[in-house]
Amino acid sequence: MGLPWYRVHTVVLNDPGRLLSVHIMHTALVAGWAGSMALYELAVFDPSDPVLDPMWRQGMFVIPFMTRLGITNSWGGWSVTGGAIPNPGIWSYEGVAGAHIVFSGLCFLAAIWHWVYWDLEIFSDERTGKPSLDLPKIFGIHLFLAGVACFGFGAFHVTGLYGPGIWVSDPYGLTGKVQSVNPAWGVEGFDPFVPGGIASHHIAAGTLGILAGLFHLSVRPPQRLYKGLRMGNIETVLSSSIAAVFFAAFVVAGTMWYGSATTPIELFGPTRYQWDQGYFQQEIYRRVSAGLAENQSLSEAWSKIPEKLAFYDYIGNNPAKGGLFRAGSMDNGDGIAVGWLGHPIFRDKEGRELFVRRMPTFFETFPVVLVDGDGIVRADVPFRRAESKYSVEQVGVTVEFYGGELNGVSYSDPATVKKYARRAQLGEIFELDRATLKSDGVFRSSPRGWFTFGHASFALLFFFGHIWHGARTLFRDVFAGIDPDLDAQVEFGAFQKLGDPTTRRQVV
């Protein structure tokens, strides 16, 4: 049977046994990929510095998803939060990866069994003896089971009643750890950044799924609805399933890109909007101001800023800075962060504190401009020296570092001042090791960016797939060329197009 590549799935159209087989094989491939990818990532992951070289800087993709569900330890003796773990237990990263691979193998064998033994009694209609599936009943079964899984996840896993809980952190991604979460049943449960909403929504959605599943198991659809929505056609199942998948893909693309409790910044990196809004910068300044109010010196106040918080306030961690076709992790771009040099404070010869204008997300280059507290331009690095009025040399700008490795160090040499002014455009200044990975200095996106791009792209593709298969199943009779209102006796083979008397075959 010479089928073109885009029609090969017709072989399982009226073959329930082998339809089940290919879906089990698909599950085997998905689970096998997940387990294998996890083992690969564990082989290349360096857990030694969770602050300056976290998983998202190293381009890990599946490890963050395991971590947000409660896995933090490795059989290698390390924990993702730092420190040694003497007894990680069976549900370590490797344990979960191994479970997926074993499950994949079992699904592989089950797929082969169902391919060979395709003509099972369960798939035949006792009235006609032909293979058929009771699709409304199958829908009810799947809805019920999905509801049980959803309810169980929210009521047991997330709450810690029987399970580890989930990854929970503070708004600035500093204190993250796996912990149990109480369901949020009030209006706060609708805040996308409240972890309690994850528990309550899974419990509520699971309950609804269980009830809806029982309804569809006990109530048959009306005949007109059954025929109108083509409920007996397997392509209807395909169309509506694609709709569910593309809708979910659009939703998770949004929660990933804009941020939510389900996508912690410690696991996936910060969002671009946190750079755009100066989110971490404001928190750093708030902490410094609080320190100064307690009679700390500038040096003491800046030294108390966590390195982790300062690192978030660096444009190289902005997922929107990576180009679409720049492959590799963030570490392959600007390098592996080694240490925070400290916060540079610039002053002119009159003693005014100057602030470097930060580079907006979608700029590759940006003029170096220093403004005072009122936003008035006081210094810059000019493009044309002949016309300059505010050059670092003319204004006499100096820089002094507070906190970090250069704490207390000051520079007045114009070349050095300009170097640090350029780097201050990019947020807090870090020492970056480009030699180890031969990093090219060009920014890369984080797994947050890849996930969003991938899911948004496939959601769009699947949206068109839903329209395509929905149209095929709703208008199958039209596409087949049979007019449902045709009263005349139709002789198969008499016309080139079935039922069209204008295309009567010529007898030679």
Curated annotation (Swiss-Prot):
Chief site of localization: plastid
Biological process according to GO: photosynthetic electron transport in photosystem II
Cofactor note text: Binds multiple chlorophylls. PSII binds additional chlorophylls, carotenoids and specific lipids.
Gene Ontology molecular function terms on file: chlorophyll binding; electron transporter, transferring electrons within the cyclic electron transport pathway of photosynthesis activity
Annotated localization: Plastid, Chloroplast thylakoid membrane
Topology versus the membrane: Multi-pass membrane protein
Gene3D superfamilies: Photosystem II CP47 reaction center protein
Keywords of this entry: Chlorophyll, Chloroplast, Chromophore, Membrane, Photosynthesis, Photosystem II, Plastid, Thylakoid, Transmembrane, Transmembrane helix
Protein family according to the UniProt entry: Belongs to the PsbB/PsbC family. PsbB subfamily.
Assembly description: PSII is composed of 1 copy each of membrane proteins PsbA, PsbB, PsbC, PsbD, PsbE, PsbF, PsbH, PsbI, PsbJ, PsbK, PsbL, PsbM, PsbT, PsbX, PsbY, PsbZ, Psb30/Ycf12, at least 3 peripheral proteins of the oxygen-evolving complex and a large number of cofactors. It forms dimeric complexes.
HAMAP family, sorted: PSII_PsbB_CP47
Job description of the protein: One of the components of the core complex of photosystem II (PSII). It binds chlorophyll and helps catalyze the primary light-induced photochemical processes of PSII. PSII is a light-driven water:plastoquinone oxidoreductase, using light energy to abstract electrons from H(2)O, generating O(2) and a proton gradient subsequently used for ATP formation.
Official protein name in the record: Photosystem II CP47 reaction center protein
The species this protein was found in: Panax ginseng
Gene name of this polypeptide: psbB
